[in-house]
Amino acid sequence: MKVMSTVPAVSMRRLDSGQYIIDFGQNMAGWVRMNVRGNAGDTIRLKFAERLNADGTLYLKNFRDALSEDIYVCNGSENGRPWRPTFVTHGFRYAMVSGMKSPKAEDFTAEVVYDDMATTGSITTSIIF
């Protein structure tokens, strides 16, 4: 897997719970790179979903018991250092962040990943699906 493109956050809004919903504007496979800020011991959580509930929260019913979450525990010296997870990919358009001090949309960038294989052909049809 290789990062093939990056997608900035389209919007970010605060929920009444204090968590933030980030919209990247398109569904993708990949992960979120974030600029980390926090005090030692702060736990930042990112949860992922492909759509939202009517109330604007993440729709997670399709995961059943599975977790789609990244967790970062701050050591207090990050000062905006970028971080991305390893050994995981998510299918998502939306991410919910909690535990981060004063997050901004520009702190989050989606990294789209897929196999780095050469394109060997294509097809065009007149049929619209």
Language-model regions, residue ranges each:
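Extracellular/oxidizing-compartment recognition motifs
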Residues: 1-129
